[in-house]
Every structure is written in C-alpha cells, then in structure tokens.
Amino acid sequence: CRMGNPGRLTTDIGPVIDGEAKTNIERHIQTMRSKGRPVFQAVRENSEDAREWQSGTFVAPTLIELDDFAELQKEVFGPVLHVVRYNRNQLPELIEQINASGYGLTLGVHTRIDETIAQVTGSAQVGNLYVNRNMVGAVVGVQPFGGEGLSGTGPKAGGPL
C-alpha cells in the first residue's frame, strides 16, 4: 500500500489527525509487540512518500493478532486492525465480551457460515457491522459515524450490512 499525501490519487492511506494520535497509536502497537503479539505492517517504499513521513503524522497500516479480545482496553483510532481467532463454540462468549466492553463503533466478521452471520448480527451491539466486506463508513467530519455505548457521533452512515 502507498502511504503519503492524500491529495494524490495513488495514495492508499494518509496521515492520522495529529501528533498526539500518532504517538498514542504507535505506543499501542509497541505495547502489543512487547507482549509478543504478531504485528504486521505494510507500506511500499517510495522516496517521495518517505520524505513526507518525516514531517507528517503517518502511521503504517498495521494488523495485530490478539490471543483474546480482553487484550483491548480501549478503542484505537488509526490504521490498526485487530484480529481475534476463536473456536466456533466460543463465539457467544466473544460477543458478550465485545458487548460488555462499553465500546461498539464498528465490528467486522468474515465467514462463509450463515449461522455465524445470524449469530453475530443478532447479538453484537455495535453501530456499524460489516459482513464479508471492507470496514469503512462515514467521511470524518462530514457524516455522522454511528456507534453503541461510548462510541460514535450519531446514526450509521450508509446502508445495511
């Protein structure tokens, strides 16, 4: 992926909102690394972009694999995707953990099992629930971005699942 100036059509990911956000996100990523979590970051090197990274608030897109949902204590607003693998018989408990967290902005599930889709969509208390698709929603500062509990700014942008 290409990280840099969002004004270029070839850019996949731009900067985060400010220096404080960058610091908090990078601290979270480092904490997960120090706990031994698998952390994957993907950015294609480009000399023009690399110059921008030095002065901007860029954070590389990051995937972190968690052993348990309980490892997340707060929402992370940035290009970070947390992946939790679970056994099928543990799904009800996982949904309960998500619902009990107090946060419920966005949840994504990828599965080919209709029963799993029904169980998640029927039980998860989140504002934005995406099934087998990318997890994008509203334009920040332009559209409301719905959530549940301590998350979101209003009703969900866009249509159904």
In which residue ranges do the predicted regions lie?
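Conserved C-terminal structural/oligomerization subdomain of aldehyde/semialdehyde dehydrogenase
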Residues: 50-161
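Acidic, glycine-rich loop-and-strand cores that form catalytic or ligand-binding grooves
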Residues: 36
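Flexible, glycine/charged-enriched surface loops at secondary-structure junctions
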Residues: 3-10, 39-43, 106-112, 130-134
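Flexible, acidic loop-helix segments that line cofactor/substrate-binding pockets
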Residues: 1-27, 43-58, 74-78, 141-144
